[in-house]
C-alpha cells in the first residue's frame, strides 16, 4: 500500500493542497467532458471549459507553455463549438457527424502548422526550461490537440484519430513533469477516444 502511495502521491509532496485538489478536479471534469463528447452531448463544452481553465493554471506552474496555449485555444474553440452544436433549423440540428472534405483537410493542416509555429516561438520567447525531445513533444501535441478540437467543434469524425495520437504522445510528457494524475487521465482519454471513434462512425452510417 505504501508503494502505491509513493507512486501516486510522492511527486506531489511539494505541492499545495489547493493544487492537488485542482488537479483532481481537472481530472474528473476532463473525463466527464470526453464522455459527453462521445455521446454527442452538448454538455461536453461547459464541463470542458472548466477543465481547460484549471489545466491552464496547472500548466503555468510547470511552464508547459504549449499546453497553456492549447487550453486557452480550447476555451475559445469550445465557445464556438457550444454555439455550433446547438444550432437548429426546423427543430433539427444543423451540425451532424461527418467526414472532412479535401478542403477541410487543407484547413486542418493549416491550423496545425500555425499552432506549431506559434508554440515553437512561445517556447523561445519565454525561455522555457524544456529542451530537446520534451520541448518538441509539447509543440507537436499543441498542434494536434487544437486541430482535433476544431474538428470536434464541427463534428468531424477524424477529430478522434487526432485525439488518440495526441493522447498517446502526452502521457510520457506529463510523466516527465511528475503529473501522475494527469498522465492517468490521458490513458483514460485514449480509451474513451477509441470508443468515441467507433460510436461516431456508427452514427455516420445511420
Model segments located where?
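Membrane-water interface of transmembrane alpha-helices
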Residues: 73-90
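Individual alpha-helical transmembrane segments in multi-pass integral membrane proteins
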Residues: 67, 71-77, 186
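Membrane-interface helix-loop junction between the first two transmembrane segments
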Residues: 36-50
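Hydrophobic alpha-helical transmembrane segments of multi-pass membrane proteins
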Residues: 48-58, 77
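Gly/Ser/Thr-rich helix-start
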Residues: 31, 49, 64-67
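Polytopic alpha-helical membrane-helix bundles and their juxtamembrane interface segments
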Residues: 2-39, 88-92, 96-206
Amino acid at each position: 500500500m505504501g508503494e502505491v502511495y509513493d507512486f501516486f502521491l510522492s511527486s506531489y509532496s511539494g505541492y499545495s493542497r489547493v493544487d492537488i485538489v485542482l488537479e483532481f478536479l481537472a481530472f474528473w471534469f476532463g473525463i466527464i467532458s470526453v464522455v459527453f463528447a462521445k455521446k454527442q452531448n452538448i454538455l461536453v463544452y461547459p464541463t470542458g471549459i472548466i477543465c481547460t481553465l484549471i489545466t491552464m493554471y496547472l500548466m503555468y506552474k510547470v511552464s508547459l507553455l504549449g499546453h497553456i496555449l492549447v487550453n486557452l485555444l480550447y476555451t475559445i474553440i469550445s465557445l464556438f463549438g457550444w454555439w455550433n452544436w446547438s444550432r437548429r433549423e426546423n427543430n433539427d440540428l444543423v451540425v451532424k457527424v461527418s467526414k472532412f472534405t479535401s478542403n477541410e483537410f487543407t484547413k486542418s493542416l493549416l491550423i496545425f502548422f500555425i499552432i506549431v509555429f506559434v508554440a515553437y516561438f512561445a517556447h523561445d520567447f519565454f525561455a522555457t526550461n524544456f529542451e530537446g525531445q520534451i520541448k518538441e513533444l509539447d509543440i507537436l501535441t499543441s498542434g494536434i490537440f487544437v486541430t482535433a478540437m476544431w474538428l470536434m467543434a464541427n463534428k468531424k469524425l477524424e477529430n478522434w484519430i487526432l485525439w488518440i495520437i495526441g493522447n498517446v504522445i502526452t502521457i510520457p510528457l506529463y510523466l516527465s513533469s511528475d503529473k501522475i494524475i494527469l498522465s492517468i487521465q490521458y490513458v483514460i482519454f485514449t480509451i474513451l477516444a477509441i470508443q468515441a471513434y467507433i460510436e461516431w462512425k456508427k452514427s455516420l452510417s445511420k
